[in-house]
Amino acid sequence: MTPIVAVVGATGTGKSALSLDIAERLRAEGRAAEIVNADAMQLYRGMDIGTAKLPEVGRRGVPHHMLDVLDVTAEATVAAYQEEARRAIGGILERGAVPILVGGSGLYVSSVLFDYDFPGTDPEIRQRLERELEATGPGMIHRRLRELDPVAAQRIGAHNGRRLVRALEVVEITGPQPERATAEPRPWHPARILALTLPREELVPRLDARVSGMWRDGLVDEVAGLLSAGLADGVTASRAIGYAQAARQLAGELSEEEAMEETRALTRRYARRQVSWFGRYADAVRLDARDDRLLEHALDALPAARP
């Protein structure tokens, strides 16, 4: 059975480049491959510079899925993503190609790879919890979640208010889960996970340089255009790292240097969470992103995907 190839890792480790290299090599060997995005912010049309989204010309003729599928005013939900991404993967498999899942949004990746089930939503509960978040901050929500679902509280951390609200909403809908099993759920489909790693002392300078490049490449102008398209009303998109800071710069709330430095700090924190999340994938093949033979080592781990 053709497996899903998942290329995961922290921001700045070279996931997109490796996924394209794998797809090109498979194509040269007579096996088609298609890429499925698993970066939550790359779902949004027009959010290109700040998400390091590959332009069409940079995709080397490899079909890509789950890019530019939402307006910035729409809310991204992992449940909707799971459904659409799995549908895309099903189509790829039917065409006899190899699906390559690529991204750093941990829950989005896991929602595809594993047998996750996402409860529905309750607008009244959600609105009440969002009011509480606005009034008290994420710390209080996190403490409540820790009492009711300690596994979720530990996974999310104390700062991600939007995800804490969603987790507490799920608990209120489904009931407390103080003893929920911590074992990874069953795989949805056979998969080979390639996890790119990089020492923190080398990753941080890459991340800082990436943020500087975002501003140099025109992130502020991109955000100005998105604000006219309703970015400020987007529950998910308006909070994206870099975009929120550029919007505050445009509003005169931050200087350019303050906006960049806040983005750097948040990007470093996000990368730490990514490393922690993907570190829990026990069956992943760990690959050093600095390796001169990275592609060869990645392909060595994919015998079932090759002709």
Swiss-Prot record:
SUPFAM superfamilies, A to Z:
P-loop containing nucleoside triphosphate hydrolases
Which InterPro entries does the UniProt record give?
Dimethylallyltransferase, IPT, P-loop_NTPase
Reaction(s) catalyzed by this protein? adenosine(37) in tRNA + dimethylallyl diphosphate = N(6)-dimethylallyladenosine(37) in tRNA + diphosphate
* EC number(s) on file: 2.5.1.75
Gene Ontology process terms (BP): tRNA modification
Keyword Plastid among record annotations: no
Q: What GO annotations for molecular function exist for this entry?
A: ATP binding; tRNA dimethylallyltransferase activity
Query: Which residues of the sequence carry a binding annotation for ATP?
Result: G9, A10, T11, G12, T13, G14, K15, S16
Which key words tag this protein in UniProt?
Answer: ATP-binding, Magnesium, Nucleotide-binding, Transferase, tRNA processing
Name its co-factor(s): Mg(2+)
This protein's superkingdom? Bacteria
Entry annotated with the keyword Nucleotide-binding: yes
Binding residues annotated for substrate, in chain numbering: T11, G12, T13, G14, K15, S16
Q: Where is this site: Interaction with substrate tRNA?
A: S105, R126
What quaternary structure, including any partners, is listed in this protein's UniProt entry? Monomer.
The record's NCBIfam families line, in alphabetical order, gives: miaA (TIGR00174)
Function summary: Catalyzes the transfer of a dimethylallyl group onto the adenine at position 37 in tRNAs that read codons beginning with uridine, leading to the formation of N6-(dimethylallyl)adenosine (i(6)A).
Homology family:
Belongs to the IPP transferase family.
Q: What is this protein called?
A: tRNA dimethylallyltransferase
**Record lineage:** Bacteria, Bacillati, Actinomycetota, Actinomycetes, Micrococcales
